[in-house]
Every structure is written in C-alpha cells, then in structure tokens.
C-alpha cells in the first residue's frame, strides 16, 4: 500500500485544540516573520540601491536592488529541496525551526555590511552572497510552515487557514515592516536614515530567530506525519525516502507544471502589488517616508482581510472557481488602479488606490497554499508544496526587476506594470482553467 492511500488520519490522530492553535500560530508567525525579513529590503530599496548599486539613473539602481531580491528567490527552490526532503522524511517541526532561525540571523547580518563607499565593489558582492544564503533558508520556511499548519487544520477550514497563513501572514509581515519603517524613519530622519536607519531595520530581522524557540518548545509534530511514521513502522504502508526525486518522476511532472502556472501568477500578483507599492509610492508619487509608511500599514491590514476572505471563499465555492474569479479581477482592475494612482496627487486618493491594489494582490494567492497541499500526499507534501510555491514565486519575483528595466523613467512605471500584469494573469487564468478541483482531497 502506498502513502497515497492513507486514510482516516483525522480520526486516527485526534487534533488537540491547544496543539492545533500552536501549529496555526507557528505557521502564521513563521511566514509573517519570513515576509517581514524580505519586506525590509523592499521598504529600503531606494536607499540600499544608492548605497550598494549607485547609478545616475534611479530606475537602474532600483532594478539592481530588485535583481538582488530575485537572487534570493532563485535560491528558494534549493532551500525547499533541502528542507522539504528533511521535512518529508524526518518531520516538519525541526525543519521549520532551523529554517526560521536561519532567516532571522541572515537578515540581521545585512545590517553589518559595508557600503560601496566604505569597501568598494566587494560590498555589492557580499550583499549578493548573503542574499543567496538567505534564499536557502527562506525556501526551507515555505516547505515547513506551508505544510504543518494545514496538516493540523480542521478539514472544513483549510481554505481559511490557507488565506490566514499564506496571505494573512504576508500581510502581518508587511505590517510589521511598515511599523519598523515608520519607527526608524522617525528615529533617523532625512539623511540619517541612509546611515543607520536601514541598518537597524535589518537588525530587526532577529525577531524571526526568537520565534524559533517558541516552535521548539511548544509545537508538536504534524498528525499526518506521525500517522505516516506509525504505519510505516507497522509495515502497512511504504513511503519514499527520496521525495524530491519522486516529484520529478513521470507521474508527478505534469502536476508540478500546472501548479507553476498558478504560483507564477500568484507570486507575480503579490510582488507587483504589495512588493512594489513601497517603491511606487516613493518613486512615482513622491510620497514622504512617514506618510508612505502609514499608507503601507493600512495596505497590509487590507491585504490580510483579502487573504482570509478569499481563502475562506475557496472552502465554499472550491479552489478552481476562486482562482478563475480572482484572475479575471486582477487582469482587469489592477491596471486601472495603478494608472489611476500614478495620476493622483491627493494623499487620500493615493491611499484608496494603494488599499485597492493590496486587496487585489493578496486575493490572487490566498488559496494557493491549501491547493498545493491538496495536490500532494503526505510523503512528498513538504517537498511538493515548497518547490511548487518557490519556483513559481521565484519567477514572479523577477517581475519587479523587469518592470523597472522596461521603464526608462519613473513616469513609465505605471504602464509597464499594467502590461506585465495583464499578460501574466492571462497565464494564471489558463492554469486555473486546466487544474482539477482539489477541495477535500487531502491524504
């Protein structure tokens, strides 16, 4: 009997309320702090660009920073392969602990780096190397947090759990980064921010490492993984000890490919909305840091509402219909919002557009987490979910770089964004049309 035939896990391993709560909190905070660490770079991108990748053309400097962000994303599949393998073979909990602590330490290390004015061209090289290291740990966080939370969740609430962790966690991470950005902008106003403010923002990444101790001391292993190990020991099932290799076998390659159409669109939607808003507000709208941070905090709250709503909606109408609905809305409404926001001069109008963009952007990937978990059985779930998510989001994470490169000046950014969004969400809709409905298929 293969692990794909494993049934009755919920009844064989009753979910204790306290452990379910701990698992959900750990998954939510793990992903929140992971995104918090990544958002720090997005919020200080213009400053970091000038310090590590100086250029007389602002959009080129900005593109270089986003390229360094894409470097991290490219290493995330590697991290998913490493930590996903460990999570599938040895357990989710320890994989999650090591990955989250690693992200926190590597993020804080950015605050110690010398700038190009202090160390010459070794500075951007060190910056990129550290981004590579961080990417491996981030990939590990995805493979573990995106699995253990859904395996503890109640069957009829897995979609809401998906939105809460995947999108809500990202919203919390962005909210935390916005708050830290506001505090640091106040403590280090004007030119002082380019000296110490950005460094202190990176030091705040150590919050992730503190969460590691919560996980180590309060979280039990996933009931699905424990049941799998129990049945393996009894000889009633077999499970592969090479989950990554199995994912690329003929039986799973098509599943992985279709998943990528969804995760690529969801990742692009996220990085071209919540991820690009900080730079858009500064470079296109010219909003001051203190005002921008407040707008971004509001956008983060709206992003959480959107993610939980659309994740929960998928529990009622299914994952496939939710993807189709959101894809159409994104392709039509996001360009309208960005073009309108570029013309807005009133702070209230800019804020409303930013809130609408954040709402739409997080709707696009709210159900993705549970969709991916339902696509794979327990024996390869961490590896399959992690690789599907990280490869798609790695591709999506390159889009801000391409948007910046396609824009000769800040005035061209809104139209470039609109074109990229329409094209990519057509691809997303094709994927949504081709995938099967997965609601309730959890094994």
Provide a role label for each language-model segment.
Residues 159-185, 208, 388-400:
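Glycine-rich segments within core transmembrane alpha-helices of 12-TM secondary carriers
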Residues 79-91, 307-319:
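Helix-to-loop junctions at the C-terminal end of transmembrane segments
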Residues 42, 252-303, 396-400:
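Extracytoplasmic gate region of multi-pass secondary transporters
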Residues 212-219, 371, 422-443:
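Multi-pass alpha-helical transporter architecture, strongest
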Residues 89-101, 316-328:
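Cytoplasmic membrane-interface "Motif A"-like loop-to-helix N-cap segments
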Residues 45-77:
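Extracellular/periplasmic helix-loop-helix junction of adjacent transmembrane segments
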Residues 120-139, 348-363:
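Hydrophobic core of transmembrane alpha-helices in multi-pass small-molecule transporters
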Residues 101-120, 329-344:
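C-terminal ends and interior cores of transmembrane alpha-helices
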């Amino acid at each position: 009997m293969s692990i794909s035939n494993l049934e009755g896990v919920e009844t064989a391993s009753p979910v204790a309320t306290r452990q379910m709560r701990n698992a959900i909190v750990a998954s939510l905070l793990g992903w929140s702090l992971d995104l918090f660490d990544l958002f720090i770079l997005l919020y200080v991108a213009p400053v970091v660009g000038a310090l590590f990748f100086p250029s007389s053309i602002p959009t080129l400097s900005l593109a270089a920073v986003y390229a360094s962000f894409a470097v991290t994303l490219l290493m995330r599949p590697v991290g998913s392969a490493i930590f996903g393998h460990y999570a599938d073979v040895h357990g989710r909990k320890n994989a999650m602990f090591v990955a989250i602590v690693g992200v926190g330490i590597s993020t804080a290390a950015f605050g110690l780096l010398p700038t190009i004015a202090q160390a010459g061209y070794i500075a951007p090289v060190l910056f990129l190397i550290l981004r590579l290291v961080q990417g491996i740990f981030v990939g590990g966080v995805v493979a573990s947090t995106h699995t253990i939370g859904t395996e503890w969740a109640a069957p009829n609430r897995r979609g809401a759990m998906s939105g809460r962790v995947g999108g809500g966690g990202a919203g919390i991470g962005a909210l935390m980064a916005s708050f830290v950005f506001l505090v640091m902008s106040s403590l280090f106003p004007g030119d002082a921010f380019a000296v110490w403010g950005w460094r202190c923002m990176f030091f705040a990444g150590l919050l992730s490492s503190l969460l590691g101790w919560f996980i180590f001391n309060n979280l039990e292993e996933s009931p699905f993984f424990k049941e799998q190990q129990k049945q393996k020991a009894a000889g009633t099932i077999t499970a592969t000890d090479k989950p990554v290799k199995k994912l690329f076998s003929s039986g799973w390659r098509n599943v992985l490919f279709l998943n990528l159409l969804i995760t690529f669109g969801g990742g692009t939607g996220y990085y071209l909305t919540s991820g690009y808003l900080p730079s858009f507000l500064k470079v296109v709208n010219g909003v001051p840091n203190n005002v921008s941070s407040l707008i971004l905090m509001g956008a983060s709250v709206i992003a959480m509402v959107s993610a939980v709503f659309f994740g929960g909606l998928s529990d009622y109408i299914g994952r496939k219909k939710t993807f189709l609905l959101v894809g159409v809305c994104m392709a039509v409404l996001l360009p309208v919002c960005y073009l309108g926001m570029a013309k807005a001069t009133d702070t209230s109008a800019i804020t409303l557009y930013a809130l609408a963009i954040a709402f739409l952007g997080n709707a696009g990937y709210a159900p993705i987490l549970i969709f991916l978990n339902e696509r794979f059985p327990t024996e390869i779930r961490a590896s399959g979910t992690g690789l599907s998510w990280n490869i798609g989001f790695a591709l999506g994470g390159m889009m801000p770089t391409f948007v910046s490169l396609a824009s000769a000046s800040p005035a061209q950014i809104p139209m470039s964004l609109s074109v990229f969004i329409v094209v990519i969400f057509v691809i997303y809709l094709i994927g949504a049309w081709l995938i099967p409905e997965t609601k309730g298929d959890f094994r």
